[in-house]
Regions:
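Bacterial N-terminal signal peptides that target proteins for export
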Residues: 1-8
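C-terminal motif of bacterial Sec signal peptides marking the signal peptidase cleavage site
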Residues: 16-20
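Bacterial signal peptide processing site
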Residues: 22-25
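Post-signal peptide N-terminal segment of mature Sec-exported envelope proteins
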Residues: 30-48
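Short, hydrophobic/aromatic-rich segments at coil-to-beta transitions
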Residues: 41-46, 70-71, 114-123
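Secretory pathway targeting signatures of secreted, lumenal, and periplasmic proteins
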Residues: 48-97
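Signature of long, low-cysteine stretches enriched in small and polar/charged residues
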Residues: 101-153
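Surface-exposed amphipathic alpha-helical segments
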Residues: 145-168
Length: 168
């Protein structure tokens, strides 16, 4: 009987620690919106990579997986990122944003940002349990990945840094 009580107490303590230490999806969503807006408003990162007529900033932790016409695929650990650049669209274009479709019930984040010369956006959609599609764009530039709940805000911020840096 005493062993059961000790086991139950340990399980209860472990459950409390796991729940208390995990970041909630709601917190990640709040962080995502704030980080994206800040990254959009910050000075663009200096470009450090180029392919054909596109130059861009790529964080040191990311590697180039493949390069194709208007598409680049990056990898960070097991997470893939797909960058699409439409050089026919200006930085204030809304065509790519409108192609993402209207806001749905599955969208946890669906925000837009504007300044004098640019139109930016972020969309986070749950695709399955603990897996979210993160889409960040400015004008004719769009970067997409799938992330776990705990990676949403960090991924989105990094993505906006990349997208903001793209020159074509």
């Amino acid at each position: 009987m005493k062993n059961r009580i000790v086991l139950f107490a340990c399980l209860l303590l472990l459950t409390g620690l796991l729940v208390g230490c995990s970041v909630s999806v709601d917190d990640e969503i709040k962080n995502t919106t704030a980080k994206i807006e800040e990254a959009f408003n910050n000075k663009p990162m200096e470009t450090n990579k180029s392919f054909e007529s596109i130059s861009y900033y790529l964080p040191n932790a990311m590697k180039i997986e493949s390069e194709g016409t208007n598409n680049l695929i990056f990898e960070q650990g097991k997470q893939l990122y797909i960058l699409f650049v439409n050089p026919n669209e200006e930085l204030d274009s809304k065509v790519m944003f409108e192609s993402t479709g209207a806001k749905t019930k599955k969208d946890l984040v669906f925000e837009t940002f504007e300044d004098e010369n640019r139109f930016g956006y972020v969309k986070v959609t749950e695709v399955e349990e603990n897996s979210y599609e993160v889409l960040v764009g400015i004008g004719g530039i769009k970067l997409t990945t799938q992330a776990k709940a705990s990676q949403i805000s960090e991924s989105a911020e990094q993505m906006m840094q990349i997208v903001s840096s793209v020159k074509y």
